[in-house]
Curated annotation (Swiss-Prot):
Residues 30-102 form the PAS domain. This is Circadian clock protein PASD1. Residues 506-536 have a biased composition (Basic and acidic residues). Changing residue 45 to R: Reduces inhibition of CLOCK-BMAL1 heterodimer activity. One of its GO terms (molecular function) is transcription regulator inhibitor activity. It comes from Homo sapiens. C-termini of isoform 1 and isoform 2 are sufficient to interact with and to repress the activity of CLOCK-BMAL1. The gene is PASD1. Testis-specific. Expressed in a broad range of cancer cells, including melanoma, lung cancer, and breast cancer (at protein level). Testis-specific. Found in histologically normal tissues from patients with uterus, lung and small intestine cancers. Widespread expression seen in solid tumors and diffuse large B-cell lymphoma (DLBCL)-derived cell lines. Isoform 2 is expressed in all DLBCL-derived cell lines, while isoform 1 is preferentially expressed in cell lines derived from non-germinal center DLBCL. Changing residue 36 to E: Reduces inhibition of CLOCK-BMAL1 heterodimer activity. Residues 365-412 are annotated as: Necessary for transcriptional repression.
Length: 773
């Protein structure tokens, strides 16, 4: 026991074992006491900062987790934890100021990473529990932090270090192990060093064992070695299935060795002769198990009454057997019945009893057995008589059943007939033999009662054999039917499996088709969506274009209105050519009179202006010619003159804009304002034109021809002042014009003639003087 204590002490603190050989329960320091106690509990001491940095750790961490203290100091605790537990542990460690009393004690469980994992293996973790308290380095300096700092630094820390840096988490880390024994006995060294020990009251029992402290774990373990023979016996007892079992019973009685065959359970009881059943209801199999006569039967005295009764019963059975030819007894079988009987059986009863006494010593057990067997024999006599009749009835019933089976088999195919036909021949031969046997039995003398008993027993056995032979073809036929049914069932199962496979394949094909249809529908939907989006985009573009066009139109409308107003307000300037001189005439364009600008010339008289003449839609006569100004130009000015008054042609200048030229005024051409007078009637017929020409023929002066631009051309001037060029033909032409002189070209219709109200230049006085009487 002392050696085991030394081994444990070596594991706990190797340094102390070198100094002291005897273990003394004394602790030099508080840290040492904590280290020893924690090592017994599979734990170690740790010191953490408020940030989770490991400040100090005990040396026994290397034996528990495989980390060296120098390597682990300075690391953060969160680096040794799995990723799933980092947030939870950080919330536990962090301190919130001001601290409450309940927050100074912290407990939590987590998993720490092991350090002695082999290269290439995955990281292993140990389930540990932290039990730490918040400590102030200044208040508990000599007790807790004596190994970290010197004593003279206590005052300096209290003065200069803030409160957050003075607080540390000091406590213990215990490893929670659940399967320690399994780890101990996996190694060979541990299994070889198993020692039978017994725990004493002096040493406490440690419940939790560490895998690293192997010998300390053996103090509480007991290795028990069992002999192979005892183990085999125990295994035999625990096993429920035993093929052969040898059972012996010790005592004054006889030793009986039995071999019991069993599939599931075995019987371990001894069989005694006095345990025979006493009830008369015995089955047929009990008698078939005794082919020979027991010698005890020969010792009983012969009863004359029994023999006489037995003879009478045999005489009665004789005629019954003759009527029933199916009694399965042959003369050879009868001769065989008497063969096993020795001549010694006919010895007197006294000699038989004397010979039985040395074999069976005088004891109460032997007498009881003999008396019980005698009673059984009496009861067997009665049962044999009854069962002979029952057997005859059973044989008849079986024959009827066989006939039905034959009828049924004849309907079946011929392949099955060879199984039944030999049995029929044997069954037909049996009744003939039975008839001969019964006839011989009646003629013979009455046999001995013992022979009668043997005869009855063998007749029963032979009848049972015959019934068994008759049942064999039925069993064979039933077996064939069962085989056929099994084959049919197998075929049905195979067909069902094939159908299931086909259904599965069809389902797979249907699923694939459905998936393809779904994909097609999705593609169609996507295409329709794209088309709708394109249509919407086009509609949006069209709407935007319409809006832009409307905006432009709205912007152009006020500009056009302004241009029209400017054109109406500006005075009309005309360039008039009189002879070879050009005269610019400025005509005021009042707002109340609309003067349209057309591509048709307007004639002015030198003395008096005339009303504009509308052209008739008739063909030009041959007596007149058409004078064209600039025949190849786009805007052609047309004038009609009579041939009589036609003078030499005048070279007319092209119609150009002379807005930059200086204004020239002439007194020979009076300027008349344009006034609107509704009293002037329009000339609708050629006669009106002739009449007007005749009235004005006396005062006919030089004709003034005015060329104007069209309305479209005026719109392109963009606000420039409009001028009318007026050309005056030669003066001095006399003679009234022909009535057809005012006939316009055929291209102009009467409805297109313009009113003379637009270019009235005649003053009111001249108009009154020229009116016809």
């Amino acid at each position: 026991m002392k050696m085991r204590g030394e081994k444990r002490r070596d594991k706990v603190n190797p340094k102390s074992s070198q100094r002291k050989l005897n273990w003394i329960p004394s602790f030099p320091t508080y840290d040492y006491f904590n280290q020893v106690t924690l090592q017994l509990l599979d734990g170690f001491m740790i010191t953490l900062s408020t940030d989770g940095v490991i400040i100090c750790v005990a040396e026994n961490i290397s034996s528990l987790l495989g980390h060296l203290p120098a390597e682990i100091v300075g690391k953060k605790l969160l680096s040794l934890l799995p990723d799933e537990e980092k947030d939870e542990v950080y919330q536990k460690i962090i301190l919130k100021f001001p601290l409450l009393n309940s927050e100074t004690h912290i407990e939590f469980c987590c998993h720490l990473k092991r350090g002695n994992v082999e290269h290439g293996d995955s990281s292993a973790y140990e389930n540990v529990k932290f039990i730490v308290n918040v400590r102030d380095i200044c208040n508990e300096f000599p007790v807790v932090f004596s190994g970290l700092f010197s004593s003279h630094l206590c005052a300096d820390f209290a003065a200069c270090v803030p409160q957050e840096d003075r607080l540390y988490l000091v406590g213990n880390v215990c490893i929670l192990r659940t399967q320690l024994l399994q780890q101990l006995y996996t190694s060979k060294a541990v299994s070889d060093e198993a020692v039978l020990t017994q725990d004493s009251d002096e040493e406490p029992f440690v419940g939790e064992l560490s895998s690293s402290q192997g010998q300390r774990g053996h103090t509480s373990m007991k290795a028990v070695y069992v002999e192979p023979a005892a183990a085999a016996a125990a295994a035999a007892i625990s096993d429920d299935q035993i093929d052969i079992a040898e059972v012996e019973q010790y005592g004054p009685q006889e030793n009986v060795h039995m071999f019991v065959d069993s599939d599931s359970t075995y019987c371990s009881s001894t069989v005694f002769l006095d345990t025979m059943p006493e009830s008369p209801a015995l089955s047929l199999q009990d008698f078939r198990g005794e082919p020979e006569v027991n010698p005890l039967y020969r010792a009983d005295p012969v009863d004359l009454e029994f023999s006489v009764d037995q003879v009478d019963s045999v005489d009665q059975e004789g005629p019954m057997d003759q009527q029933d030819p199916e009694n399965p007894v042959a003369p050879l079988d009868q001769a065989g019945l008497m063969d096993p009987v020795d001549p010694e059986d006919s010895v007197d009863l006294g000699a038989a009893g004397a010979s039985a006494q040395p074999l069976q010593p005088s004891s109460p057990v032997a007498y009881d057995i003999i008396s019980q067997e005698l009673e059984l024999m009496k009861k067997l006599k009665e049962q044999l008589e009854e069962r002979t009749w029952l057997l005859h009835d059973a044989i008849q019933n079986q024959q009827n059943a066989l006939e039905l089976m034959m009828d049924h088999l004849q309907k079946q195919p011929n392949t099955l007939r060879h199984v039944v036909i030999p049995d029929l021949q044997s069954s037909e031969a049996v009744p003939k033999k039975q008839q001969k046997q019964h006839a011989g039995q009646v003629k013979r003398p009455l046999p001995h009662p013992k022979d009668v008993k043997c005869f009855c027993g063998l007749s029963l056995s032979n009848s049972l054999k015959n019934t068994g032979e008759l049942q064999e073809p039925c069993v064979a036929f039933n077996q064939q039917q069962l085989v056929q049914q099994e084959q049919h069932l197998k075929e049905q199962q195979r067909q069902l499996r094939e159908q299931l496979q086909q259904l599965r394949e069809q389902r797979k094909v249907q699923k694939q088709k459905k998936m393809q249809e779904k994909k097609k529908l999705q593609e169609q939907k996507m295409q329709e969506k794209k088309k709708l989006q394109e249509q919407r985009r086009q509609k949006k573009k069209k709407l935007q274009e319409r809006k832009k066009w409307q905006g432009q139109m709205l912007q152009k409308e006020p500009e056009e209105e302004q241009q029209k107003q400017q054109l109406q307000e500006q005075p009309l300037k005309h360039n008039v050519i009189v002879g070879n001189e050009r005269v610019q005439i400025c005509l005021q364009n009042p707002r109340d009179v609309s003067v349209p600008l057309c591509n048709h010339p307007v004639r002015f008289l030198q003395a008096q202006p005339i009303v504009p003449v509308q052209r008739a839609a008739e063909q030009q006569p041959s007596g007149f010619y058409q004078d064209e100004n600039c025949g190849q130009q786009e805007d052609e000015s047309q004038s009609f003159y009579p041939e009589a008054y036609q003078g030499p042609p005048v070279n007319q200048l092209p119609l150009i804009d002379t807005s930059n030229s200086e204004a020239i005024s002439s007194s020979s051409i009076p300027q008349f304002p344009i006034t609107s007078d509704s009293t002037i009637s329009t000339l609708e017929t050629p006669q009106d034109y002739i009449r007007l020409w005749q009235e004005l023929s006396d005062s006919l002066g030089p004709v003034v021809q005015v060329n104007t631009w069209s309305c479209d051309e005026q719109g392109t001037l963009h606000g420039q002042p409009t001028y009318h060029q007026v050309q005056v033909s030669e003066v001095g032409v006399e003679g009234p014009p022909d009535p057809q002189a005012f006939q316009g070209p055929a291209a102009y219709q009467p409805d297109q003639m313009r009113s003379a109200e637009q270019t009235r230049l005649m003053p009111a006085e001249q108009r009154d003087s020229n009116k016809p009487c």
